[in-house]
Structures are given as C-alpha cells and as structure tokens.
C-alpha cells in the first residue's frame, strides 16, 4: 500500500466558503471542485506550513491575510485513481477578510458558496466530509 500525505484547506469569507475548479493541466482530479490542496513534499514539513504555502501558490494570499480557525486530525481515503494507494488528508479551516484571490494554473475557476450548496458541485473525494467536520 502506498500513502501520500496531503493538505486540504477550506477558506471562509464571512458565511461563504471558497471552491476551486481544478484545471485540466493538473495531474489528478481534473475539472472537479476542491479546496486549496497540495502534497506534503517532505517529512520535515509540517502540514500547517504546507497549507499556508499552497494557499499562497494557488490563490495568492500571504500568511498575514489568512487566519487559522481550526484544524482536524488527518483522515484516510482510498484513491479512486490509483490501486493500493491511500491519501492521508490533513484538513484546515482558514478565514480571510476579503474575497479577492488570484488563481494560478492549477485551478481554472473559483466560486464563493454557501457551505450547504456544496452538494451541487462535483468535488474531489471526501471534500464534503472535510468541510462539514471543520464547520
């Protein structure tokens, strides 16, 4: 069995949450909606520091513009794309004071939605569970 450690961050602005549509240029889960996510690249890196790096890279928010509201213990989900592969997901909830973001190439669209509306979007696996566990 192979394991990959990843972070998934939900970003909240007032009562809305940010969803990102993964572009067709990414390696996995193309054209589905997600939070801000990324692989923890080495054992010396903490999940929180990786989450902040991914937020800056994917939506252009520097650390002083985000506030950590909550983190949960990791969850494991089996990969839908790779056999004998498990994703260890470290979930975070951040808050921002402004809805202004700048997408990079990893995502093609973004929306701010009411959390309950997530059921209307095709998302990466476990995103709904992660979201409602954090809220």
Q: Which residues does each PLM region occupy?
A:
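NUDIX/MutT-family hydrolases
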Residues: 91-93, 102-132
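A generic structural micro-feature
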Residues: 1-3, 29-32, 82-88
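Short loop segments at secondary-structure junctions
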Residues: 13-16, 23, 95-100, 115-117
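Short secondary-structure boundary/capping segments
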Residues: 1, 9, 25, 84, ...
């Amino acid at each position: 069995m192979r394991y990959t450690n990843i972070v998934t961050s939900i970003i909240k602005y007032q009562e809305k949450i940010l969803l990102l549509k993964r572009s067709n240029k990414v390696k996995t889960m193309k054209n589905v909606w997600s939070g801000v996510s990324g692989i923890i690249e080495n054992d010396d890196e903490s999940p929180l520091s990786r989450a902040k790096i991914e937020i800056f890279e994917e939506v252009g928010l520097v650390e002083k513009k985000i506030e950590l509201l909550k983190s949960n213990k990791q969850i494991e989900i089996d990969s839908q794309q790779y056999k004998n592969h498990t994703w260890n997901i470290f979930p975070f909830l951040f808050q921002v004071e402004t809805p202004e973001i700048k997408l990079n190439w990893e995502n093609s669209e973004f929306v701010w939605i009411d959390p309950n509306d997530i059921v209307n979007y095709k998302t990466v696996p476990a995103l709904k569970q992660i979201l409602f566990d954090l809220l």
